[in-house]
């Protein structure tokens, strides 16, 4: 920093640091200017407040470089009011506005004219604009000054007012003024004059100061400018010096080369003269020898010597040729250097222009700075300070002026030096031109020498060429003779074989003719039957509608009757309940008294034992004494202490406490057995020692009298080991609940007697305990005052005998494992010692059949509350004893009542107790699962399980203790219901299946609430049916189901969950099973949307057959874990009818029958309502690795996937983040690309039963089902030229590069189907590509042109997601940005020029260099990008070497596709990467270029919306135009509904029809759309009369098609053509006649030949469908007769996996019986007749790919024989990872690669482009599967296959130059087999086939074929409009 500036900054450092407020902004600007390093910035960030500003100034003072101007610029931008502090050292006051009172002068000038009070003058300068806030530095000074001025102003104002008053009195007369006049003080006058003078001086000083500041600022800016200019000129000077030195060196080098060339030319001239002399001598010698002696020996010697000399000359020639090629290469390099120098000159000129622009901007900034400095005027009241500051400024200005003069002198010197350098450069250029002219002369002389050498060489070779030609002819004749003999033998054999085949074929032809006659007869019969069926169908439909209405009315009446019946039953249940309560209480009392009397009769019973809690039984146990010395350990059991230490409090009996497994006592004694007598020794009131003594004293056998408790259904903890056998899922689900832990004796609950320990509490006072904690439940209990109503889930006994052995042993085992068995009663301990064990987290709600009718209002039960529990007395760990039911105990009649006494009311607060452990339950007859303790939830509150066998209910009304028990009642019909799972409330609504328990062998005993039927709505016509397979890979699938139409039937209504549900009586009507998919949300139920009324006539029989016959393949993979929201539109509901079921339902599963255990074990599909949430066992397919419902696996599209969706279901990209419903599950079970959706054909089959208006007989079109499966059954060979065509294979293909919008479904039609609005539903099917931008759309946040910006990208291992191309003059541009990639997120745009990449300059880099740099692995990337799309567009257009014919893409053929360049959408470079992407700008419509507008100044009317109510099939509107100019309304009939003031008028351009865009549709498409029956229409039209007048009467369509069949014209106007002919269609609705097109036949050069009439696509599709169906009729045995089933199913389906009702298939729709809603509208529907194509004229040479044997030899021969035409594609060696190479292939950088040892040989796109730009055919060395990848890159190679007859033929190939070695037998066989495999798999890609033979013959054929194909027009599949 300069000393003056350093001193100035040091003086104002403190004041500036205190006044600086926006420090962060200043730091940012300084860092951007380079004044602060990153380390200094971090150091500053650590400081805070004023310390940061002080540290900043200290750092700037400490720096050697001068950053004063950077600081000044930063302050000027952020805090301009601080600049005076910087220059005036803090003497300035606050900046004032120009209009405010900022000085004393201004204060005096605005004094009030009237007599204000002194208080109003206290605020000086308040009038006018308010001054800006003063800086902190001068605030005190300003305040003092203002106070002084205010005092003076008060005095002056008072005196002025006095003078004014006196003046007023004086003017009106002296008589009024009686007051004495006081003369003014002379001192005041003097002071006033001095003040005015001082103010004027101050004002002049201020003006001078302002001018000085302005001049200083200007000088500072000029100084900075000249500094920068000087540095740039110095750099340019050094660069020019380097260039001059380089040119000098090159000049010297060229001179040396010129000298060498001249010397070599002289040597060659001398050698030529010597050779001529020598040749003359030789000729003379030869003549002499011939004259003297004509012996042959001498001639041979002369010949040999001549040949030797010829060889020497040839070698010399080769050396000269090599030198000449080197010189040519050097010349080329010199030319490139010259071009680089020219570019450098242009760059310098651009820099000069930029400097001029910068100067202009500096002047503008200077003007702005002057304006900004006016705000910095401050109040300076002290004249001395102002004068001192002015002197300082003058001194500084002088310094700056001196610097300015120095800089100007330097500038003059620099200008002189630059002129000098320019002169030197001009001299170098002139010298260079001279050198180039001399070089041209040398080259011309060399050419002359070369011609002379060639003449000499031709003369020398003339003698040998004749000999070689003779030998070659002889060899060729020999080969021809051998081949002719071999071919003759083969031909004879083939003739014999063909003769036999001809005879057989003649016989087959006769039989086929006979069969055709029979088939014609059958067809006629079938058509007649079809007409009858159509009539019957219509009558049946009307009858079904009447029956449906009657059924609805009957069901509504039935529902009312059921409600009244439920009320009656409710009253009856209340009475019967009270009666049963009294009866049970009396029975219990009688049983208690009986037991009491029985126990009192025994003297051994202790009176302290509670006789009401249990029953006892006595048993005699006998042990065999094996030895005399025996103890308790040998017997295997242990006893309690008895009297001394009782096992139970208050009970002194001796109890068995332990029984060892496998011991003698095992099986005889049980834990808790009471030992009464051992060997006749009474143990009453005895201790353990006495018992042991009695045991050991016995001799022989040991007899023990044991009293044990009878089983009341207690729960036993039973260890159980389950072998999972490799499966991850045990099949057990858990759930929490609220249970009664204890009942306090004497409490109201104990007195009531119905509440027992272990009962689950479902609801308290009608409040369901779902998702409630234990504290909340207890607060509900405490809040009850007068009465309490509980809804309980009772635990009922399951066995009559209780096996309670080894309880304590099980407690010990439970420390290691926790398992459970299905539900047993709970055990109560003796004398009020309740053994409360862990209640199972899954209970079974078992009701007796008479109580099933009593339960009426059972709602959803919750299971999310905590367990109430009580630990086992005397045990450290709680247990859950439960018994495993036997198979014989599964009947309902085997249940016994739980007669537990001493039941009291009151739930014990167990918060202080140990938490209860939750158990997994879902076990089989003998199964439980082993669960480690460490995996059990210690809180026991959120296990997240389900209730697989329990269907609970909560009463919605106050029903007191609504669960009762009574043994052995009659059976009843169960109506299971489901409840939502409360433990897993998700964030979104999910689809979950109902409880499917068919995989459990244990009988499902389910009782739920019976809901009465409600009048069904139209939305109930389709339900879901849920089935599960028993396989381990079972999954849930949606199946459409319809309620039975056979009365009496109560279809499940859609009920509001807020409405109370009522019990329904058992009914004998058989109800069809369905399942409900519910939302697992916060207790809310998502509703299924209603269907249209027209969809109700899908009969239940057909749907049931769908459910029975269709099975999902077991090989289908699991679903994804994502689960779809339950928002299911009617479209998906309707289409789900066609989805195959996973598991096949048993016959019993179709209807309800009286309950039996066996029946329940066979099927577990309950009747569920669509609005009721369900809870069931979650099968393995429901784990997080799977999903359910209608979530369908979408096809995975890779680069090589080109599949057409015949039914139009579009695929979904994989990076899609949302799940959508799909109308088919076809893709669930496969990852192949067979996208033919079965749902579409099934749907059309069902829809065919609905009668609707159809087209006239001449316009009947094939149904969508026929269109769907005919692609594989029409026996038309499909051999398109290019595999990207739609019919390129038997499966079809779809080009991603050319068709960015997915095919639309033919079902997507606004007719009777609810699929008509896919864009308005929540399940709109996703598309392949993002919707393209409109014509004028541009991103608002796009960067400015020519504004470099830094882009930071956190890359990591992910690809960058961009494609790049090189510019014409260097540079790298972004040609594509992938949506969602890291580059897209970072802000890279299409058209960005990459200036730098991680600091590496890419401004002049080539594309290949940039790819290598960008491909480097790094975590963080910094890119300097500049948005400049225009240069890229010009470059890309100039490099484009092929174009589309405009007629092939008329009026936005590429509309909707984002491929192509921004300006010319029809330009396609076959070697450029043009893949559609969101970063690529949208293609502009070419309508503006093809449609001429007459008067541009005339305003076009705005589009309008027209609504038409369509009352008839024909709309009465005539159309004209087409996709070329648009479809216009030609005429509107008088009786048309479109007629009217708000209707259509002639000249209207149809823009939209409904929701469909008609701008690029053909007139036939619009006509077909208008024929479809609709109630109301919505059209968007625009009146364009002038265009209509031009279009009217002219063909308006324009597109190319490829014929896929042969046609012979029968009448004159028809057109004949052959398969693969290209036709140009110009009218799709000639003269308003539907069914034919007018087309031109084109030749190979796309020239029109003949125009004629051809059948339309719809007519041909109908014809093909009819032929297809007729060809399917076959006889299984003799083809003579058909079975009855075959006759019934005359028209058979194609797909074998579809539903078939009989062995031979079921009825298919008759081909002519279709409605208009099955007509496919769009062009992207698969057609077997025509294929839309577009023309590409390739101006550049296409690459050539050779396939077959001996490729290397053929390529080498082609390159050597025709070097100007062919060049092999070089393989680049890359040492990178496999992932990097594959990423390059994915990004279209590499075409193919081969793995070598340690590296990869890669074929790049850049190398192909480089060879093509040299005007040569590139011989590719890639695998056949990469052909499709080339097509994606718009590279269309010529694929030629070399076909040999056999491996022996390959082995026999010879060539003296290219194939010297013999091909081995093994090698030839391998090559032949490989060639055969390629021929089978990739024959559709072959452009031509060359028959194998001699290598020269093969090369000749290849040359001819390549020339022919290059001259042809290339036709590629066109994008659908």
From Swiss-Prot:
Residues 116-143, 857-898, 930-1121, 1204-1227, 1243-1266, 1280-1343, 1434-1501 are annotated as: Disordered. It comes from the Eukaryota. Residues 1724-1907 form the Guanylate kinase-like domain. Signal peptide: none annotated. Brain (at protein level). Residues 873-898, 1217-1227, 1292-1324, 1434-1443, 1450-1460, 1483-1495 have a biased composition (Polar residues). It is a peripheral membrane protein. Keywords: Cell junction, Cell membrane, Cell projection, Coiled coil, Cytoplasm, Cytoskeleton, Membrane, Phosphoprotein, SH3 domain, Synapse. GO terms for molecular function: beta-catenin binding; cytoskeletal protein binding. GO terms for biological process: apical protein localization; epithelial to mesenchymal transition; epithelial tube branching involved in lung morphogenesis; establishment or maintenance of epithelial cell apical/basal polarity; glial cell differentiation; maintenance of cell polarity; metanephric collecting duct development; midbrain development. Residues 139-601 form a coiled coil. Residues 1017-1030 have a biased composition (Basic and acidic residues). Residues 620-710, 705-796, 1350-1429, 1504-1585 form the PDZ domain. It holds the Pfam family Guanylate_kin. Residues 1-90 form the CARD domain. It is found in: Cell junction; Cell membrane; Postsynaptic density; Cytoplasm, Cytoskeleton, Cilium basal body. The modification Phosphoserine is found at residues 264, 295, 900, 1000, 1021, 1209, 1263, 1334, 1669. InterPro entries: CARD, DEATH-like_dom_sf, DLG5_N, DLG5_SH3, GK/Ca_channel_bsu, Guanylate_kin-like_dom, MAGUK_Signaling_Regulators, P-loop_NTPase. Gene3D superfamilies: 2.30.42.10, Death Domain, Fas (1.10.533.10), P-loop containing nucleotide triphosphate hydrolases (3.40.50.300), SH3 Domains (2.30.30.40). The modification Phosphothreonine is found at residues 984, 1011, 1183. GO terms for cellular component: adherens junction; cell junction; ciliary basal body; cytoplasm; glutamatergic synapse; plasma membrane; postsynaptic density. PANTHER family: DISKS LARGE HOMOLOG 5 (PTHR46360:SF1). Belongs to the MAGUK family. Acts as a regulator of the Hippo signaling pathway. Negatively regulates the Hippo signaling pathway by mediating the interaction of MARK3 with STK3/4, bringing them together to promote MARK3-dependent hyperphosphorylation and inactivation of STK3 kinase activity toward LATS1. Positively regulates the Hippo signaling by mediating the interaction of SCRIB with STK4/MST1 and LATS1 which is important for the activation of the Hippo signaling pathway. This is Disks large homolog 5. The gene is Dlg5.
């Amino acid at each position: 920093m300069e000393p003056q500036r350093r001193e100035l900054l040091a003086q104002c450092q403190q004041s500036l640091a205190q006044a600086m407020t926006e420090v962060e902004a200043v730091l940012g600007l300084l860092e951007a200017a380079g004044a602060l390093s990153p380390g200094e910035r971090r150091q500053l960030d650590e400081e805070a407040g004023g310390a940061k500003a002080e540290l900043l100034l200290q750092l700037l003072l400490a720096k050697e470089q001068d950053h004063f101007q950077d600081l000044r610029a930063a302050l000027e931008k952020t805090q301009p009011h601080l600049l005076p502090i910087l220059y005036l050292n803090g003497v300035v006051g606050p900046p004032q506005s120009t209009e405010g009172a900022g000085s004393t002068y201004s204060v005096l000038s605005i004094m009030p004219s009237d007599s204000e009070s002194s208080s109003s003058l206290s605020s000086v300068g308040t009038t006018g604009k308010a001054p800006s806030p003063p800086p902190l530095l001068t605030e005190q000074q300003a305040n003092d000054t203002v106070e002084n001025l205010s005092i003076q102003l008060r005095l002056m104002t008072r005196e002025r007012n006095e003078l004014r008053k006196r003046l007023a009195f004086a003017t009106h007369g002296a008589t009024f003024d009686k007051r004495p006049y006081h003369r003014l003080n002379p001192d005041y006058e003097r002071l006033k004059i001095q003040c005015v003078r001082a103010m004027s001086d101050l004002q002049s000083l201020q003006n001078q100061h302002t001018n000085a500041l302005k001049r200083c600022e200007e000088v500072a800016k000029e100084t900075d400018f000249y500094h920068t200019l000087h540095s740039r000129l110095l750099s340019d000077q050094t660069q020019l010096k380097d260039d001059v030195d380089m040119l000098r060196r090159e000049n010297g080098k060229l001179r040396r080369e010129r000298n060498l060339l001249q010397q070599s030319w002289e040597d060659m001239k001398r050698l030529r003269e010597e050779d001529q002399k020598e040749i003359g001598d030789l000729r003379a010698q030869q003549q002499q020898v011939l004259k003297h002696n004509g012996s042959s020996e001498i001639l041979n010697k002369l010949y040999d010597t001549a040949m030797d000399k010829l060889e020497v000359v040839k070698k010399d020639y080769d050396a000269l040729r090599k030198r000449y090629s080197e010189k040519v290469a050097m010349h080329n390099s010199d030319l490139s250097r010259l071009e680089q120098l020219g570019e450098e000159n242009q760059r310098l000129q651009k820099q000069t222009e930029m400097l001029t622009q910068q100067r202009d901007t500096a002047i503008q900034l200077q003007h702005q700075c002057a304006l900004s400095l006016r705000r910095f005027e401050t109040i300076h009241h002290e004249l001395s300070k102002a004068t001192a500051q002015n002197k300082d400024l003058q001194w500084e200005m002088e310094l700056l002026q001196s610097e300015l003069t120095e800089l100007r002198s330097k500038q003059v010197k620099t200008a002189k030096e630059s002129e000098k350098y320019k002169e030197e450069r001009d001299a170098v250029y002139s010298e260079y031109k001279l050198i180039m002219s001399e070089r041209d002369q040398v080259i011309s002389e060399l050419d002359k020498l070369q011609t002379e050498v060639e003449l000499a060489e031709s003369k020398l070779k003339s003698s040998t060429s004749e000999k070689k030609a003779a030998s070659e002819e002889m060899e060729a004749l020999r080969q021809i003779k051998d081949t002719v003999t071999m071919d003759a033998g083969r031909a004879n054999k083939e003739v014999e074989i063909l003769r036999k085949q001809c005879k057989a074929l003649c016989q087959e032809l006769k039989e086929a003719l006979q069969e055709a006659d029979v088939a014609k007869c059958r067809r006629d019969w079938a058509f007649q039957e079809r007409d009858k069926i159509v009539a019957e169908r219509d009558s049946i439909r009307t009858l079904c509608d009447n029956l449906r209405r009657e059924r609805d009315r009957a069901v509504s009446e039935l529902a009312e009757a059921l409600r009244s019946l439920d009320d009656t039953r409710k009253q009856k249940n209340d009475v019967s309940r009270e009666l049963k309560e009294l009866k049970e209480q009396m029975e219990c009392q009688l049983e208690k008294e009986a037991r009491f009397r029985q126990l009192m009769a025994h003297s051994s019973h202790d009176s302290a034992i509670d006789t009401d809690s249990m029953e006892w039984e006595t048993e005699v146990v006998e042990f065999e004494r094996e030895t005399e010395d025996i103890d308790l350990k040998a017997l295997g059991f242990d006893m309690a202490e008895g009297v001394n230490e009782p096992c139970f409090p208050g009970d002194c009996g001796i109890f068995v406490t332990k029984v060892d497994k496998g011991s003698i006592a095992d099986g005889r004694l049980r834990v808790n057995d009471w030992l009464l007598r051992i060997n006749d020794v009474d143990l009453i009131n005895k201790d353990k020692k006495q018992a042991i003594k009695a045991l050991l004293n016995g001799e022989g056998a040991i007899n023990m009298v044991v009293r044990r408790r009878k089983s009341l259904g207690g729960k036993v903890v039973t260890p159980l080991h389950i072998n999972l056998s490799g499966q991850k899922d045990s099949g057990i689900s858990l759930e929490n609940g609220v249970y009664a832990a204890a009942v306090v004796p004497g409490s109201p609950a104990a007195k009531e007697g119905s509440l027992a320990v272990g009962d689950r509490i479902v609801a308290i006072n009608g409040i369901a305990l779902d998702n409630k904690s234990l504290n909340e439940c207890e607060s509900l209990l405490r809040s009850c005052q007068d009465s309490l109503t509980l809804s309980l889930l009772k635990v009922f006994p399951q066995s009559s005998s209780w096996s309670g052995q080894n309880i304590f042993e099980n407690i010990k085992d439970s420390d290691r494992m926790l398992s459970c068995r299905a539900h047993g009663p709970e055990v109560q301990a003796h004398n009020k010692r309740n053994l409360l064990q862990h209640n199972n987290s899954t209970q079974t709600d078992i009701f007796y059949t008479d109580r099933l009718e009593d339960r009426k209002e059972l709602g959803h039960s919750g299971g999310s509350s905590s367990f109430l529990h009580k630990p086992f007395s005397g045990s450290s760990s709680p247990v859950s004893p439960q018994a495993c039911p036997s198979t014989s105990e599964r009947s309902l009649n085997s249940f016994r009542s739980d007669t537990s006494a001493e039941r009291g009311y009151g739930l014990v607060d167990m918060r202080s107790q140990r938490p209860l452990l939750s158990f997994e339950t879902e076990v089989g007859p003998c199964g439980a699962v082993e669960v480690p303790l460490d995996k059990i939830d210690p809180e026991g509150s959120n296990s997240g399980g389900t209730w697989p066998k329990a269907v609970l209910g909560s009463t919605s009304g106050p029903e007191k203790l609504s669960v009762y028990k009574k043994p052995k009642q009659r059976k009843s019909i169960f109506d299971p219901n489901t409840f939502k799972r409360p433990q897993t409330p998700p964030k979104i609504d999910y689809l979950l299946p109902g409880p499917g328990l068919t995989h459990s062998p244990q009988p499902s005993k389910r009782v739920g609430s019976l809901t009465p039927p409600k009048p069904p709505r139209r939305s109930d016509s389709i339900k879901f049916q849920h089935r599960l397979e028993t396989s381990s890979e079972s999954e849930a699938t949606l199946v459409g189901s319809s309620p039975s139409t056979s009365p009496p039937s109560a279809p499940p209504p859609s009920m509001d969950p807020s409405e109370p549900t009522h019990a329904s009586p058992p009914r004998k009507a058989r109800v069809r099973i369905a399942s409900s998919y519910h939302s697992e949300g916060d207790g809310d139920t998502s509703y299924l949307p209603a269907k249209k009324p027209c969809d109700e006539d899908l009969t239940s029989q057909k749907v049931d057959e769908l459910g029975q016959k269709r099975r999902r393949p077991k090989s289908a993979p699991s679903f994804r874990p994502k689960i779809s929201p339950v928002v299911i539109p009617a479209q998906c509901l309707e289409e789900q009818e066609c989805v195959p079921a996973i598991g096949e339902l048993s016959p019993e599963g179709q209807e309800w029958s009286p309950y039996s255990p066996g029946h329940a074990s066979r099927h577990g599909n309950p009747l569920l309502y669509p609005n009721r949430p369900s809870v069931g066992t979650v099968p393995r397919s429901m784990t997080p690795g799977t999903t359910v419902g209608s979530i369908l696996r979408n096809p995975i599209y890779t680069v090589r996937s080109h599949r057409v969706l015949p039914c139009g279901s579009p695929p979904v990209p994989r990076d899609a983040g949302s799940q959508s419903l799909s109308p088919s599950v076809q893709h669930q079970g496969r990852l192949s690309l067979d996208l033919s959706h079965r749902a579409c054909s099934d749907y059309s089959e069902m829809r065919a039963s609905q009668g609707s208006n159809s087209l006239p007989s001449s316009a009947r079109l094939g149904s969508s089902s026929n269109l769907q499966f005919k692609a594989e059954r029409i026996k038309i060979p499909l051999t398109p030229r290019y595999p990207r065509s739609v019919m390129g294979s038997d499966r079809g293909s779809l080009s991603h590069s050319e068709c960015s919008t997915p095919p639309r479904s033919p079902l997507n039609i606004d007719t009777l189907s609810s699929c008509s609005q896919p864009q308005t539903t929540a399940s709109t099917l996703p598309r392949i590509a993002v919707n393209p931008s409109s014509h004028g759309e541009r991103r608002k946040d796009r960067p400015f042109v020519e504004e470099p910006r830094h882009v930071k990208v956190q890359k990591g291992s992910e690809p960058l997601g961009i494609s790049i191309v090189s510019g014409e003059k260097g540079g790298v541009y972004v040609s594509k940005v992938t949506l969602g990639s890291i580059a897209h997120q970072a802000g890279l745009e299409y058209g960005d020029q990459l200036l730098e990449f991680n600091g590496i300059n890419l401004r002049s880099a080539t594309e290949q260099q940039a790819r290598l740099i960008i491909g480097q692995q790094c975590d963080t990337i910094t890119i300097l990008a500049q948005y400049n799309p225009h240069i890229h567009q010009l470059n890309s257009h100039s490099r484009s070497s092929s174009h589309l014919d405009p007629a092939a893409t008329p009026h936005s053929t590429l509309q909707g596709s984002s491929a192509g360049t921004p300006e010319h959408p029809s330009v396609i470079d076959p070697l450029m990467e043009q893949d559609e992407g969101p970063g690529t700008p949208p293609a502009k419509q070419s309508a503006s270029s093809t449609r001429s507008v007459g008067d541009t100044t005339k305003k076009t009317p705005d589009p309008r919306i027209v609504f038409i109510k369509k009352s008839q099939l024909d709309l009465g509107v005539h159309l004209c135009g087409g996709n070329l100019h648009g479809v216009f309304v030609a005429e509107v009939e008088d009786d048309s509904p479109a007629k009217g003031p708000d209707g259509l008028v002639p000249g209207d351009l149809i823009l939209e029809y409904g929701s469909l865009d008609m701008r690029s549709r053909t007139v036939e498409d619009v006509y077909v759309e208008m024929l479809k029956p609709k109630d109301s229409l919505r059209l968007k039209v625009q009146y364009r009369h002038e265009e209509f007048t031009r279009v009217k009467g002219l063909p308006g369509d324009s597109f190319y098609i490829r014929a896929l069949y042969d046609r012979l014209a029968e009448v004159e106007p028809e057109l004949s053509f052959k398969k693969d002919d290209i036709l140009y269609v110009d009218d799709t609705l000639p003269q308003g006649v539907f069914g034919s097109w007018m087309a031109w036949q084109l030749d190979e050069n796309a020239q029109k030949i003949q125009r004629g009439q051809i059948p339309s696509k719809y007519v041909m599709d109908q014809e093909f469908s009819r032929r297809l169906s007729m060809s399917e009729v076959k006889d299984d045995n003799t083809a003579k007769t058909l079975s009855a089933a075959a006759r019934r199913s005359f028209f058979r389906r194609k797909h074998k996996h579809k539903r078939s009702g009989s062995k031979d298939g079921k009825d298919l729709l008759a081909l002519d019986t279709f409605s208009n809603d099955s007509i496919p509208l769009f062009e992207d529907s698969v057609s077997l007749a025509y294929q839309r194509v577009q023309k590409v004229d390739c101006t550049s040479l296409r690459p050539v790919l050779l396939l077959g044997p001996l490729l290397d030899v053929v390529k080498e021969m082609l390159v050597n024989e025709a070097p100007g035409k062919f060049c092999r594609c070089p393989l680049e060696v890359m040492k990178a990872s496999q992932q990097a190479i594959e990423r390059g292939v994915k990004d279209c950088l590499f075409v193919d690669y081969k793995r070598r040892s340690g590296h990869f040989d890669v074929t790049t796109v850049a190398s192909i482009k480089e060879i093509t730009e040299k005007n040569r055919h590139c011989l590719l060395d890639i695998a056949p599967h990469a052909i499709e990848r080339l097509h994606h890159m718009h590279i269309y190679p010529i694929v030629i296959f070399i076909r040999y007859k056999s491996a022996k033929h390959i082995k026999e190939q010879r060539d003296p130059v290219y194939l010297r070695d013999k091909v081995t037998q093994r090698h030839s066989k391998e090559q032949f087999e490989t060639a055969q495999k390629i021929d089978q798999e990739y024959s559709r890609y072959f452009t031509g086939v060359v028959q194998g033979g001699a290598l020269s013959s093969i090369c000749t054929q290849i040359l001819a074929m390549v020339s022919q194909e290059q001259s042809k027009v290339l036709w590629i599949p066109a994008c659908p409009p």
